[in-house]
């Protein structure tokens, strides 16, 4: 061996171990027993001579620290560049940690071998550990080429488990969020059970905010499931924070911990402005936190930090609460509360949060607390029945059979002003911003402009039963006793569309929210005979009434007339509207074409009350029943009974609806319980 020429370092690392093993085998067969110790010592020295340069070349920091300080940058780059992401020293993902139990067993088996075999195996491991990716591949190819079938079978069984990687731990948080946002609710909950790291990512606000946006107040196009409305203010304020976290603003990274506190903290490592957070939903929770904060020591910064962090609800909790409410709607699980106090039929109502206002034929307006059921105040002033009302944070406006309109400060009970402009009873009113529209039996709709103190009248052929203003598009919807609903342009004071298909008086007309999506569900709907023509879309308008043809816009760009084209900033009217009438039907219309897209059948008598949001339609009528509809499925409906007389009015929110009837009662169906 001494006379053998000295090979290069690379050749030594690849050839000499096999030569050493071969020499060792030959020595066991040919050398005398007395020379065994000398031969073993010679092989060990030769192995050290061959392995040392290899280790010094590819692991300079450990085996050649002085050389590593003066090594060329290109060589250092070549050494590190070949590693995969698991073994890249500069990567945030460290080497895959060996299983402690497996290593213990491996070490025990190694200790059973002779000392020379242990050293040889250790040299092989050291060579492979120090080798770059290319050399490792060559080593593995050589090992596989010399392995028999039992050994290959063992390798196959072992590799099957080893190649399973935690890809979410390997990826940056923003990419992990991108992947998780494609999962459904059930899959996200299962992902949170994989590991603490997965739980921190799967429970993060970035993921669940997307889930809330996709399902709350709308039907998901993928799963067909929709959840009740979330508070708009909280949704808007949190959006900026979620966008920052989704793009890894501030290099946030979820922390992995064993406790729940660590998980919550990992979701709040980025601290945007306070406006981007979600406040507590009740004053009781805030009071409880205030007591806990006051009771704690002011010297402890941890208590202060915990105090502020617990004020924000994770989006997963918001989704969970909305999901519970949605399931209650689906299975008709609700609590019922009855408000008694009126001495005549309840004709109108409105509620916001815990405030409910009702108007009755007993000429009073009552204000209720829906949480306690307590009657807070009774407003008196009208000399005949109150037929319509609407309120906001500061004022209440009522219309009465005494032909007057009154404006109240409902917090104090004071009547601020009174308007007399109709010749007969005021049946409906609606205000939006600075405009008020009132409808009357005198066949007119009067528009009151509080800003410039002006008024004008929209004439109708018969009495008007309902009116709705859309200030964004500057249009008005009206329902008339002549069996038609109309869309008016407030700028030109003209009727731009007539919806004429009811048999009998139209009692209600409302616009569906602009964000509602019905295109996919209406693609195969069967339209009424007035809606479409068998000859195609060009003949749609030919089947409508002469009044519609006379008032339909001729401008080629906008279906609503030239006034919309002249003002580029003007938004078109809502795309869909609903009407109900004494013919027991509810009809869905497309405003741009005047088509009746769908008819809802189910009531046995005339429909007096109608309300809707993006998820459902609520209606009540002379048959004493309340029906809840899905605007996408005309045949599906839930029926609620409880009134002993006709249902005159209804109010709908994300988690409850309230009705008033001729039995003098107001009934609240609450799905939050």
UniProtKB/Swiss-Prot annotation:
Record-linked InterPro entries: F-box-like_dom_sf, F-box_dom, G-protein_beta_WD-40_rep, SCF_subunit_WD-repeat, WD40/YVTN_repeat-like_dom_sf, WD40_repeat_CS, WD40_repeat_dom_sf, WD40_rpt
Annotated stretches, region: Disordered: 1-39
Domain F-box stretches: 165-211
Residue ranges of WD repeats: 341-378, 381-420, 422-458, 460-500, 554-599, 602-639, 642-673
One Pfam family linked to the record: WD40
Highest taxon of source: Eukaryota
Swiss-Prot/TrEMBL keywords: Repeat, Transcription, Transcription regulation, Ubl conjugation pathway, WD repeat
Family: Belongs to the WD repeat MET30/SCONB/SCON-2 family.
Assembly and oligomerization: Component of the SCF(sconB) E3 ubiquitin ligase complex.
The protein's name: Probable E3 ubiquitin ligase complex SCF subunit sconB
């Amino acid at each position: 061996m001494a006379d053998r020429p000295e090979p290069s370092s690379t050749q030594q690392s690849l050839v000499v171990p096999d030569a050493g093993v071969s020499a060792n085998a030959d020595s066991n067969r040919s050398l005398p027993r007395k020379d065994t110790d000398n031969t073993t010592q010679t092989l060990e020295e030769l192995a050290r001579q061959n392995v040392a340069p290899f280790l010094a070349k590819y692991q300079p920091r450990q085996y050649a620290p002085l050389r590593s300080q003066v090594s060329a940058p290109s060589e250092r780059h070549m050494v590190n560049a070949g590693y995969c992401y698991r073994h890249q020293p500069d990567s945030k993902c460290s080497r895959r940690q060996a299983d402690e139990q497996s290593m213990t067993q491996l070490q025990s088996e190694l200790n059973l071998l002779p000392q020379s075999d242990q050293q040889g195996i250790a040299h092989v491991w050291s060579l492979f550990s120090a080798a770059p990716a290319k050399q490792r591949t060559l080593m593995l190819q050589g090992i596989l080429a010399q392995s028999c079938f039992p050994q290959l079978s063992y390798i196959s069984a072992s590799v099957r488990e080893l190649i399973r990687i935690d890809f979410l731990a390997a990826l940056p948080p923003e990419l992990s969020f991108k992947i998780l946002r494609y999962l459904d609710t059930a899959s996200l909950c299962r992902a949170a059970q994989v590991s603490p790291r997965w739980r921190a990512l799967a429970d993060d606000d970035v993921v669940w905010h997307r889930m809330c946006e996709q399902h709350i107040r709308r039907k998901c196009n993928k799963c067909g499931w929709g959840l009740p409305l979330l508070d708009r203010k909280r949704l808007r304020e949190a959006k900026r924070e979620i966008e920052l976290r989704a793009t890894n603003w501030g290099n946030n990274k979820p922390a992995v911990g064993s406790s729940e506190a660590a998980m919550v903290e990992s979701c709040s490592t980025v601290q945007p402005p306070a406006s981007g957070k979600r406040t507590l939903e009740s004053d009781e929770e805030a009071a409880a936190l205030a007591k806990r904060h006051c009771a704690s020591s002011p010297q402890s910064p941890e208590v202060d930090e915990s105090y502020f962090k617990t004020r924000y609800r994770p989006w997963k909790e918001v989704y969970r609460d909305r999901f519970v409410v949605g399931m209650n709607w689906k299975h008709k699980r609700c609590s019922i509360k009855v408000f008694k106090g009126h001495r005549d039929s309840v004709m109108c109502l409105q509620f916001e949060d815990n405030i409910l206002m009702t108007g009755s034929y007993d000429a009073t307006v009552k204000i209720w607390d829906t949480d306690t059921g307590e009657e807070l105040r009774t407003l008196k002033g009208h000399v005949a029945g109150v037929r319509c009302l609407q309120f906001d944070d500061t004022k209440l406006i009522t219309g009465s059979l005494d032909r007057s309109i009154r404006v109240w400060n409902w917090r104090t009970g004071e009547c601020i002003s009174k308007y007399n402009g109709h010749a007969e009873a005021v049946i409906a009113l609606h205000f939006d911003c600075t405009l008020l529209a009132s409808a009357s039996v005198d066949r007119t709709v009067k528009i009151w402009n509080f800003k410039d103190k002006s008024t004008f009248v929209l004439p109708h052929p018969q009495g008007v039963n309902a009116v709705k203003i859309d200030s964004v598009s500057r249009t008005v919807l009206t329902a008339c006793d002549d069996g038609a609903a109309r869309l008016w342009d407030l700028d030109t004071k003209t009727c731009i569309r007539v919806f004429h298909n009811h048999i009998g008086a139209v009692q209600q007309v409302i616009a569906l929210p602009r964000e509602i999506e019905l295109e996919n569900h209406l693609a195969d709907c069967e339209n009424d005979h007035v809606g479409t023509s068998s000859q195609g879309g060009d003949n749609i308008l030919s089947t409508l009434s002469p009044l519609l043809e006379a008032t339909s816009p001729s401008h080629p760009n906008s279906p609503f007339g030239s006034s919309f084209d002249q003002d580029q900033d003007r938004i078109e009217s809502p795309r869909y509207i609903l009407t109900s009438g004494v013919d027991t039907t509810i009809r869905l219309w497309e405003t741009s074409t005047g088509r009746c897209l769908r008819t809802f059948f189910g009531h046995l008598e005339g429909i007096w009350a109608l309300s809707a949001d993006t998820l459902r339609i609520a209606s009540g009528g002379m048959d004493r029943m309340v029906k809840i509809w899905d605007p996408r499925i005309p045949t599906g409906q839930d029926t609620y009974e409880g009134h002993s007389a006709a249902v005159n009015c209804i109010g709908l929110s994300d988690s409850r609806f309230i009705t008033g009837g001729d039995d003098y009662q107001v009934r609240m169906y609450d799905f939050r319980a």
